[in-house]
Amino acid sequence: MSEPPDQVTTLTKNTTMVLVLGATGMLGNAVLRFFAQSKGFEPVGTARSAAVLSLLPRELRERMACGFDVENVDSLVRLFAEVHPDVVVNCIGLVKQIAEADDPLQAIPINALLPHRLARLCQVAGARLVHISTDCVFAGTKGMYREEDPADAQDLYGRSKHLGEVDYPNAVTLRTSIIGLELASTHGLVAWFLAQAGPVRGFTRAVFSGLPTVELARVIRDHVLPRPQMRGLYHLSADPISKYDLLQLVAKAYGKAIEIAPDDKLVVDRSLDSKRFRQLTGYSPPAWPELVRAMRDFG
């Protein structure tokens, strides 16, 4: 698979408008906060309802656009017309841990159709789309998956996410996995772990290679946006780590005194080979202790 020449572009506009879709989710909230702290960027986040705004700091509430229904084309067009984005980061997606991910009437419109609709709108608006996909498009039977490996997930969630992976001249799909804290739930690994009081199991044969949300936001800013020629699908990953070892690092970084019992019963390896992305961009992920500390410090 040939690569385009690596041409890094300095964003010449004084301010780059970044529209963050799904800004109250785990990833979207981190992306919104990160770009709000980044010079030269003007982020605007979306939420379907204003009810969650009280969970955000005041400076972020002022950056939120509420009341837009992304499943309604007219509503999306109105959003684009109001924001005039240069970049759209799609952080919307039903996550695997909730029941709706198994409902085709909900999973297919959000996970499979919406990214393609966004790419079309971005094309009309002259904007660039950064879409976030997942390692769950794979069954997890072999690990170190490459972009050309067939997506072999058997569940609706994995299949719907695969259908939503966009490949257009103005769109990049980053296939990855994330950890981080959430605004109002404990679906994710870190929030769930920090909420536990008694002993927990740490799976020694469940392998993870994703990134903290703050690191993913940094990669988008520093490695994706300056490369307008980058398009299509790329794997983005850190070095593989077991869930047991990851929880040990999280416990140490957050000062969580809890027993983590090693458990080898769950065997799954969805680790991603991101050599293609690294060769194109020069990105080298930090070691896991550093990634976890950065996640803690970001909050």
Label for each model-derived stretch:
Residues 113-152:
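Conserved Rossmann-fold NAD(P)-dependent oxidoreductase catalytic core, especially the SDR/UDP-sugar
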Residues 71, 102-117, 151, 159-162:
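Glycine-rich NAD(P)-binding loop of the Rossmann-fold in SDR/ketoreductase-type enzymes
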Residues 15-38:
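N-terminal Rossmann NAD(P)H-binding glycine-rich loop of SDR-like oxidoreductase domains
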Residues 2-6, 256-299:
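C-terminal amphipathic/interface module of NAD(P)-dependent oxidoreductases
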Residues 217-275:
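Mid/C-terminal beta-alpha module of Rossmann-like enzyme folds, strongest
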Residues 45-55, 69-70:
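N-terminal Rossmann-fold cofactor-binding loop
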Residues 67-110:
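NAD(P)H-binding glycine-rich loop region in Rossmannoid oxidoreductase-like domains
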Residues 154, 166-208, 214-215, 222:
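NAD(P)-dependent short-chain dehydrogenase/reductase
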